């Protein structure tokens, strides 16, 4: 793989994760800027490496990344006496790892569609919360 392609993939993931992480940081969310960038860029780098190595078990490696990120997301859950908060944050961490993997594999169209769906979901969720719906 050409160096320019690797840089493009990593920078695209960095830039889009930066935007999302900045928005979360600005809104004082418990998990913000750094986490989303590091998770997605790390996943992207591992996907690039796996595809470069042509491993027979690269799918298993990528699956292990997604599973491992699930544990990181679980750390974002906050329990009070009668409620649990942070499911959207946990799911966001998980989907950003998948976003990074997909871009790392060179699936730009699919990655950008996922990124768009993430924003639509988060903005819709905020709208519903702000209007006490649900």
Q: For the regions a protein language model found, what residue spans apply to each?
A:
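Hydrophobic transmembrane alpha-helices of secondary-active transporters
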Residues: 15-20, 70-78, 100
């Amino acid at each position: 793989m050409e160096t320019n392609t690797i840089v493009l993939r990593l920078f695209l993931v960095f830039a889009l994760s930066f935007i999302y992480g900045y928005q979360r940081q600005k809104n004082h969310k418990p998990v913000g800027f750094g986490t989303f960038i590091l998770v997605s860029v790390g996943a992207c780098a591992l996907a690039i490496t796996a595809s470069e190595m042509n491993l027979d078990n690269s799918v298993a490696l990528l699956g292990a990344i997604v599973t491992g990120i699930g544990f990181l997301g679980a750390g974002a859950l906050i329990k009070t006496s009668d409620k649990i908060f942070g499911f959207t944050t946990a799911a966001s961490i998980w989907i950003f790892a998948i976003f990074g993997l997909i871009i790392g594999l060179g699936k730009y169209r699919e990655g950008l569609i996922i990124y768009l769906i993430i924003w639509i979901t988060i903005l819709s969720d905020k709208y519903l919360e702000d209007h006490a719906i649900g």
